[in-house]
């Protein structure tokens, strides 16, 4: 760290700690904000502060929300009988961009008893008939799917997962919209 530029390098390190931002990009961002556009830096800082204060998890489905219950859960035009299970709230926005799904969502970041109980309550409350698993294809996640299917076997639910248009081991955030759209359209029963 250069003496006299500690604050600048702290900013570089902060940017570098973000996903997909390397040293060069972090340097460019920090330099731009400090030397070219102070207003941009202030706006980013204010926006981050507001987001951290106001965004939380939906108490029903686990999606991101600025309210106790998210817009997806409150939207009466969505199909209550179809549920898409994802492993991250950010996956919901990726699926929404595909414009191929109009049901409800449920986020299971970690499969534990609390998450399973919440899922069962959500399924019962919404009278779910179909569950679509939109999770990263892998052997571990296939076991995850089978476990949930087993726990819900007493209910009359059809299970499917997005088709293998999504490469095995690739996170949904790294899949292009066309591939994701085709994968959702080609979902397979399990």
Pin down the residues of each PLM region.
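Extended interfacial segments that mediate partner engagement and assembly in macromolecular machines
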Residues: 26, 75-138
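Extended, structured, electrostatic nucleic-acid-contact surfaces
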Residues: 1-19
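Short cysteine-rich clusters marking metal-coordination/redox-active sites
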Residues: 58-61, 70-73
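Conserved phosphate/pyrophosphate-binding and hydrolysis machinery centered on Walker-type P-loop NTPases
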Residues: 19, 38, 51, 63, ...
């Amino acid at each position: 760290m250069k003496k006299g530029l500690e604050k600048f390098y702290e900013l570089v390190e902060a940017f570098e700690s973000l996903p997909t931002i390397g040293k060069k990009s972090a340097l460019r961002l920090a330099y731009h904000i400090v030397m070219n556009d102070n207003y941009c830096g202030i706006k980013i800082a204010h926006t981050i502060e507001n987001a951290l204060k106001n965004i939380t998890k939906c108490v029903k489905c686990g999606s991101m929300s600025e309210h106790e219950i998210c817009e997806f859960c409150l939207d009466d035009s969505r199909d209550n009988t179809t549920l898409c299970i994802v492993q991250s709230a950010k996956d919901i926005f990726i699926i929404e961009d595909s414009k191929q799904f109009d049901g409800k969502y449920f986020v299971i970041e970690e499969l534990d008893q609390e998450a399973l109980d919440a899922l069962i309550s959500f399924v019962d409350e919404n009278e779910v008939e179909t569950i679509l698993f939109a999770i990263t294809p892998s052997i571990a996640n296939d076991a995850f799917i089978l476990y949930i299917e087993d726990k819900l076997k007493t209910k009359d639910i059809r299970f499917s997962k997005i088709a293998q248009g999504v490469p095995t081991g690739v996170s949904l955030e790294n899949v292009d919209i066309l591939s994701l759209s085709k994968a959702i359209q080609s979902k397979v029963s399990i």
